[in-house]
Design a protein with these regions (language model features):
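Active-site mouth loops of central-metabolism enzymes
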Residues: 1-15, 72-81
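Flexible, glycine-rich loop/tail regions that form catalytic "lids" or insertion modules at the edges
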Residues: 1-4, 17, 21, 25-26, ...
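Structured alpha-helical segments in the cores of large, soluble enzyme domains
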Residues: 10-29, 48-60, 128
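Hydrophobic faces of well-ordered beta-strands that scaffold small-molecule active sites
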Residues: 29, 71-77, 90, 97-99
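Conserved, mostly hydrophobic/aromatic
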Residues: 33, 89, 139
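Short, ordered loop/turn segments at secondary-structure junctions
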Residues: 34-36, 78, 94, 101-104
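Alpha-helix-loop-beta-strand connector modules within alpha/beta enzyme cores
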Residues: 41-73, 122-130
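Catalytic cores of alpha/beta
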Residues: 80-93
Length: 155
């Protein structure tokens, strides 16, 4: 978002755009920071996905049901750097992730880039499985109810 705007304004605008896109029939939304220019600031990816998820849960169809079920959220962000970031993003509402900076870093200079990428994905998968099994959760959906923010206003 532009340097002159606030994080709050950006999140409200992003959420409104997402709700409008879903109302117009979008079934997949990709929240990405990859195209951010030099005059822009990058919003924390977890804040972005949480704001969009919340707005879609609150948005209603004509029959009164939530618009959140109409769309899948993909988070493409450089800020996804480890298993914790992955789990928080999934807990906040992302259905799929593209940790492009992590993948680029792993493959950069590697003699076998595809092996490096496979190793990153394998490590993330094992880490996710460990987190879920430690918490006694059998489905990824169950993780979301355990994620909360401390010290952040309800808004």
């Amino acid at each position: 978002f532009h340097r002159d705007g606030s994080v709050r304004e950006h999140l409200h605008r992003l959420a409104a755009e997402a709700v409008a896109a879903v109302a117009d029939g979008a079934e997949l939304l990709v929240l990405s920071d990859q195209a951010a220019g030099p005059d822009e600031r990058v919003c924390d990816p977890h804040l972005a996905v949480a704001a969009v998820d919340k707005a879609l849960r609150e948005a209603r169809r004509d029959d009164g049901s939530s618009r959140r079920r109409d769309v899948s959220l993909v988070l493409q962000a450089a800020g996804i750097r480890n298993v914790h970031d992955v789990m928080v993003a999934l807990g906040f509402g992302a259905q799929a992730l593209c940790p492009y900076a992590m993948m680029e870093k792993a493959m950069d200079g590697s003699p076998e880039p595809s092996t490096a990428a496979d190793n990153v994905l394998s490590g993330l998968q094992k880490g996710m499985e460990k987190v879920l099994s430690t918490l006694g959760i059998h489905e990824l959906r169950g993780y979301g109810r355990l994620v909360s923010a401390i010290g952040v206003t309800p808004e």
